Amino acid sequence: GIRAQMEQLAPVQAQMGPLALARSSEEHSGPHEPWFWDPTRQGGGVLSDMGCHSIAVGWYVLTPVGKPATFLEPISVSATTSLLKWGVPRYRKELLDRMGVDYAKTPAEDFCTGIVTFKNPETSQLVQAQFTNSWMYDKQGLRLAMDGLGPGYAFELNSLKSPLEIFIGDQAAEAAADTELALEKSTASRGLLAVETNEADLYGYVDEIQDAVASFQVGRDAFLNFEYGAMITKLCQAAYMSAEEGKTIYLTDKDTQAALKNYKSLISQGRGAEVLF
């Protein structure tokens, strides 16, 4: 979806200039497995789970069409992390009973939001990617939402706006099969249900696999390589650092780069209570 939109916008970008602002969110009601809830095993909470995706796609769409994935230079990161729903005693107990993870002792964030600022090295133009992620989206299921704003043009995506919808009444609800076959993290089995007709393509798996195979066949590195993944990880850690210190993290500072190299967030150390409560 995003890749196709960028290809369609290429002629517009050539005439008007690249996107200046990207806003991305990925939200659902919480992970399936206990280890994903445990910050000491997963490395954090929703920021390290899904914030990495939102930061990555923001960087991608802000990059001028035809440029490498790391063309834009990350300049700064500003973020906050919070424990909202799953910090309430009632829901902490539910999580402990269901997953065996005690957020009274080792909590992780269930909400994060932030801004990454990038600079175009050719024009010095600054552009921004805003990200928002949560583990408390209890609507229909997993939602991916994004929009991009450029001079004179824009795009918008919402994965729950499906061309296919199903309605299941109360009498038929007991006969409904596993609703996750229709939508990941589905939270309902009756009413008006959204159906994602091609999740593998929506989440980028098809493009990534095709690029990996094509790259391997000609002996070149993939479009999204190890160094790119390491940079996304660094941006996530900078977001945790920003939330902990309550200030913008400037990635152009040498001391900051040195600190990030061995940085481990308090949340990932099991000390989230120091910053979330």
What feature does the model see in each segment?
Residues 6, 62, 66, 209-220, ...:
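Short, hydrophobic alpha-helical segments
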Residues 11-14, 232-241:
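C-terminal hydrophobic helical "lid"/dimerization subdomain
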Residues 84-124, 144-227, 231, 249, ...:
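C-terminal glycine/acidic-rich active-site capping loop/insertion
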Residues 32-141, 227:
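Rossmann-like dinucleotide-binding domain that binds NAD(P)(H)
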Residues 23-25, 80, 149:
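Alpha/beta-hydrolase-fold catalytic nucleophile elbow
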Residues 51-55, 209, 233-236:
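Short, hydrophobic/amphipathic alpha-helical packing segments
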Residues 1-33, 54-55:
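A contiguous active-site-proximal alpha/beta segment in oxidoreductase catalytic domains
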